[in-house]
Amino acid sequence: MTAIIDIIGREILDSRGNPTVEVDVHLEDGSFGRAAVPSGASTGAHEAVELRDGGTRYLGKGVERAVDAVNGEIFEAIGGLDAENQIQIDRTMIELDGTPNKSRLGANAILGVSLAVAKAAAEASGLPLYRYVGGPNAHLLPVPMMNIINGGAHADNPIDFQEFMIMPVGAETLKDAVRMGSEVFHTLKKQLAADGHNTNVGDEGGFAPGLASAPAALDFIMKSIEKAGYKPGEDMYVALDCASTEFFKDGKYVLEGEGRTLEPGAMAEYLAELAGKYPIISIEDGMAEDDWDGWKSLTDLVGNKCQLVGDDLFVTNSARLRDGIKMGVANSILVKVNQIGSLSETLDAVETAHKARYTAVMSHRSGETEDSTIADLAVATNCGQIKTGSLARSDRLAKYNQLIRIEEQLGPQAQYAGRSVLRG
């Protein structure tokens, strides 16, 4: 009854107006699942390959080759298989691709099918996706990392670091956390406008003011938290995504906005200094993706009191994560479904992290759609944290709104992660 009878891939547009893959999966019993694949702006060198067409169409960014793979080879390989056998289906597609990074069929093709299959199987079972994937213990609503100031590859301003986020750990519920974040977001907008800064929003809904340094951005955020009626370091904490690989050149960290170049040891000390001065509880990609020694220095400096998240470092890849665990590097993994390219591999990465007492943060990409799958996956994995943008743009709010619905569905079972994400 849950056999796959049809798969339809199509090319749609993401939140940046670039093509991406959407997949529909139909089962024998009439159940249906649909998934759209996200896309990143700052991508790690070790990520699975997002297949693009090249040529002039969509300036080379078309995904017709990936769509053809969905409608052709992939359907031929998994048509007739039971949608409830997720691991078998994912393995079949990975083996069909035959490359270590999914470069032949494209991670965007494989992931679209993988997620749509899970959604169809969830519908067939009569369960919401978070319950189908996570089982009866899926109940933890994640603390949002809300990206309210953008820099780096996400903005046309001098700020070197890519994201400055607020985390409303003092909220009682997810719904309250969203409200608190919204209040700070709108307060920040007023503060920026009053100081003559542009308040247009970037790819992920955050502001991109013409500030020159991380401390300048953090000072604005501190004022906005207080102005909104909350206490920094009590009700609200801060998270950074440095995206350091983007400014790591010839073995050094080139902070153009701040007008200085730092050796890896000095970069680690700078981040430790910021974490000491501001209520920063999470730093993502504080060091570059292949600067393992720098990562070790940073971990030794602040790893006991600050969450150190590997994004480009681990790329949702269990093998790279295991290497990091052995070396005592970082203490958390950012989970992006399209970095690895299948649901089962994503779940394996989260499980690997949790077994090693590393935290996991479910994450969007800068190019998103209205698809809210990652909200369900955050609850399914009980990971306790989600990074899905600011309090603007419907492609970001789709995830927050889905989390509000899930919290409502769970009723008394629902638990907001809140202060449990604090270290030390």
From Swiss-Prot:
PROSITE patterns assigned to the protein according to its UniProt record, in alphabetical order: ENOLASE
Disulfide cross-links: none
Catalytic activity as recorded in UniProt: (2R)-2-phosphoglycerate = phosphoenolpyruvate + H2O
Compartment list: Cytoplasm; Secreted; Cell surface
Gene3D superfamilies named in the record: Enolase-like C-terminal domain, Enolase-like, N-terminal domain
Needed co-factor(s): Mg(2+)
Broad class of the protein's primary localization: cytoplasm
GO terms, biological process: glycolytic process
InterPro entries in alphabetical order: Enolase, Enolase-like_C_sf, Enolase-like_N, Enolase_C, Enolase_CS, Enolase_N
Enzyme Commission code: 4.2.1.11
Example of a GO MF term: phosphopyruvate hydratase activity
UniProt similarity note: Belongs to the enolase family.
Function: Catalyzes the reversible conversion of 2-phosphoglycerate (2-PG) into phosphoenolpyruvate (PEP). It is essential for the degradation of carbohydrates via glycolysis.
Listed name of the protein: Enolase
Gene: eno
